[in-house]
Amino acid sequence: MLLYIVIIVACIISKLVPNEYWAIHLFFIIMIFMVYMYEKLDIHQKYQFWNYTMSGLSGHNVQVICKCY
């Protein structure tokens, strides 16, 4: 469901934003890919996915607190 919402928003933005703002289009393509990969994971893999993603974006180790029951 989340993937479809991101795809619809990306399509709307791509129609509204001119082509010279290619970075906005690239951002939504990356977001679609990340959401697609995230939805394929189970609950424990999702926890590790966000730890790895936040660590990669910030440049140092980040620990996301998660209560996985």
Curated annotation (Swiss-Prot):
Residues with attached carbohydrate: N51
Consequence of gene loss (knockout): No effect on virus viability or replication in vitro.
Topological domains annotated Cytoplasmic: 1-15
Cellular location(s): Host membrane
Entry keyword annotation includes Transmembrane: yes
Disulfide bonds: none
Keyword Iron-sulfur: no
Example of a GO cellular component annotation carried by this entry: host cell membrane
Membrane-spanning ranges: 16-36
Intervals, Extracellular compartment: 37-69
UniProt keywords, alphabetically: Glycoprotein, Host membrane, Membrane, Transmembrane, Transmembrane helix
Membrane topology, from the record: Single-pass membrane protein
Family: Belongs to the asfivirus X69R family.
Protein name: Uncharacterized membrane protein X69R
Organism field: African swine fever virus (strain Badajoz 1971 Vero-adapted)
Organism classification: Viruses, Varidnaviria, Bamfordvirae, Nucleocytoviricota, Pokkesviricetes
